[in-house]
Amino acid sequence: YTQEIVDNCKVIGNDDLLLVAGDISWAMNIDEAIPDLRYISALPGKKVLTRGNHDYWWKGIGSVRAVLPKGVYAIQNDAVKFDNVVICGSRGWTTPEPNAIEEAEDKKIYARELLRMEMSLTCAKNLCSDGDKIIAMIHYPPFNSKFDDSRFTELFDKFNVSAVVYGHLHGKSVRSETVVSKNGIKYYLT
């Protein structure tokens, strides 16, 4: 898959943004993640990262930012601005399926991730000037398998987000709908 990444990045210019919505490295600690961060840094464009569920090396935003190569930015409960685009995000959590029984721990994590996303969106809004666009990053899909609205999509509506980039899903079978439009917002599966 790394060759596919390199091939896809050939269309990216140095002034473009490359958004990586989590699962950045299989490393278990920050030192082991540095080669992967350098690999990402060597790709064209300005890179923005958010944490995924397999990023065990990502213990805290301060330690992550301390080792990031030039041109690579990490967001967690905050946002970063490039010209007229503000990028914000959070890891998110699994959105429940209709009529599914949710575990108490899942409810707790989902609620916490909603708060984190709202903090990030608030930060983004505070960085915005007239005409700026907000792009949100979330590792987990912000909706269930039926693409139903969720508390995450409601937050994106509330903050007038222009687009959302998400990941987490693996394999070709889940890539049937890589772009979904909901309530005027485009959601991109990366």
Per-region residue spans from a language model:
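Core catalytic region of metal-dependent phosphoesterases/phosphodiesterases
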Residues: 1-83, 150-161, 183-185, 189
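Short, flexible micro-motifs
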Residues: 25, 55, 92, 169-170
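Conserved catalytic scaffold of divalent metal-dependent phosphoesterases
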Residues: 58-148, 155
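Histidine-centered catalytic micro-motifs
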Residues: 136-143, 162-173
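Acidic, low-complexity terminal tails and accessory targeting/binding regions
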Residues: 166-186, 190
